């Protein structure tokens, strides 16, 4: 009787230990996407890396999903662009159904740089924001221009929506394919109401500024000399950053 009780107790202890170890491994595997300003970085825990085109970096979140950014350019400043379309939103949701192609006066630009909008504390911590270097217009987040994207292959320009983007779409007219259209900041020179967008095939075409079915795939500049906390820079295991450098 005592032997049976002892065996049962040992089995229970082993089961608890295996469960604890398994949960620890799961948490460790996902840690590279769940970082914030509360992370403590020791002198030997972070490392310097030379970022290259197509490296992936996790900064912030949207609709509860971590945002993975792709390195687009590494010249004077490191340009990042969202790996996926984060939401569908009109460039200028005008009542006339047409709108204006003026990006600098657009509600979309204002939303991208507003704490009540895209830069909500729910999406970006103070640490996340410290990693961003504003562009020449003082914007932390912006839509990529056609010129920024013209040297990227059509295949690499294509973007698919995030899972939460699809779940939160309110348009009953939207038929989602693998890839979707998304905005650039570039107006169509011959039409004050049309904006250049990237299509499902990765090409450029125009759409009305009031189009609510066009996606938002934002861009940002990364501050210089950042340190990497963990990750390998791939889509599956993006870099998590530890700060450093100048904005």
What is each PLM-predicted segment?
Residues 4-5, 22, 30:
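Intrinsic N-terminal pre-sequences and regulatory tails
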Residues 14-24:
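Hydrophobic alpha-helical membrane-insertion segments, chiefly the h-region
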Residues 27-247:
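Collagenous Gly-X-Y triple-helix signature in extracellular proteins
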Residues 1-12:
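N-terminal Sec-pathway targeting helices
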């Amino acid at each position: 009787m005592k032997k049976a009780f002892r065996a049962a107790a040992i089995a229970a202890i082993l089961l608890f230990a295996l469960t604890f170890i398994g949960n620890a491994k799961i948490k460790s595997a996902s840690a590279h996407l769940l970082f914030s300003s509360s992370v403590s970085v020791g002198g030997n825990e972070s490392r310097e890396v030379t970022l290259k085109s197509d490296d992936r970096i996790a900064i912030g979140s949207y609709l509860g999903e971590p945002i993975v950014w792709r390195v687009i350019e590494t010249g004077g400043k490191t340009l990042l662009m969202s790996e996926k379309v984060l939401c569908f939103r009109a460039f200028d949701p005008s009542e006339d159904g047409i709108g204006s192609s003026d990006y600098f006066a657009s509600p979309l630009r204002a939303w991208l740089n507003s704490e009540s909008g895209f830069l909500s504390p729910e999406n970006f911590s103070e640490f996340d924001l410290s990693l961003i270097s504003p562009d020449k217009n003082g914007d932390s987040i912006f839509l990529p221009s056609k010129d920024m994207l013209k040297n990227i292959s059509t295949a690499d320009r294509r973007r698919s929506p995030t899972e939460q983007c699809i779940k939160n779409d309110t348009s009953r007219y939207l038929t989602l394919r693998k890839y979707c259209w998304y905005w650039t900041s570039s107006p169509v020179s011959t039409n004050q109401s049309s904006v250049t967008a990237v299509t499902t095939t990765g090409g450029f075409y125009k759409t009305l500024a009031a189009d609510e079915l066009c996606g938002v795939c934002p861009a940002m500049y990364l501050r210089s000399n950042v340190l990497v906390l963990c990750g390998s820079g791939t889509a599956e295991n993006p870099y998590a950053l530890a700060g450093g450098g100048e904005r």
